[in-house]
């Protein structure tokens, strides 16, 4: 596998594995995602998990579209979100525009290392190694 083209070896798609999380509350699938300016961005469609540590690393947030048509997907590092006290929704620590202008993710193409790096850099985070 060439550098920058394949997925980080220890991240797996939670929807496509029987892996369980060390902390079950980290399964954020289905939760609505809001921005700091209270605008709804979308919802968590999937979670990428560190296979060895069994911890959530990246959220796949789906936004827009009608019946799946025109839907866009964005990756958000879990460090960028906070869960409300009732646990029913997440807030990204940025305005809605910041998230919707982030590098777009195509679930059909899978998670590639170069996109992961771009997402972590976009949010000012270090790429995990």
Give, region by region, the residue ranges found by the protein language model:
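Peripheral interaction segments used for macromolecular assembly
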Residues: 1-129
């Amino acid at each position: 596998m060439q550098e920058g083209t394949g997925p980080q070896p220890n991240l797996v798609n939670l929807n496509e594995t029987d892996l369980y999380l060390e902390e079950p509350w980290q399964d954020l699938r289905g939760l609505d995602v809001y921005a700091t300016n209270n605008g709804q961005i979308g919802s968590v469609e999937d979670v990428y998990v560190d296979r060895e540590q069994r911890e959530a690393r990246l959220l796949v947030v789906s936004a827009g579209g009608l019946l799946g048509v025109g839907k866009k997907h964005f990756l958000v590092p879990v460090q960028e979100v906070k869960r409300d006290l009732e646990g029913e929704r997440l807030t990204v620590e940025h305005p809605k525009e910041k998230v919707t202008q982030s590098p777009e993710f195509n679930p059909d193409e899978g998670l590639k290392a170069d996109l992961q790096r771009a997402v972590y850099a976009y949010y000012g985070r270090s790429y995990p190694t």
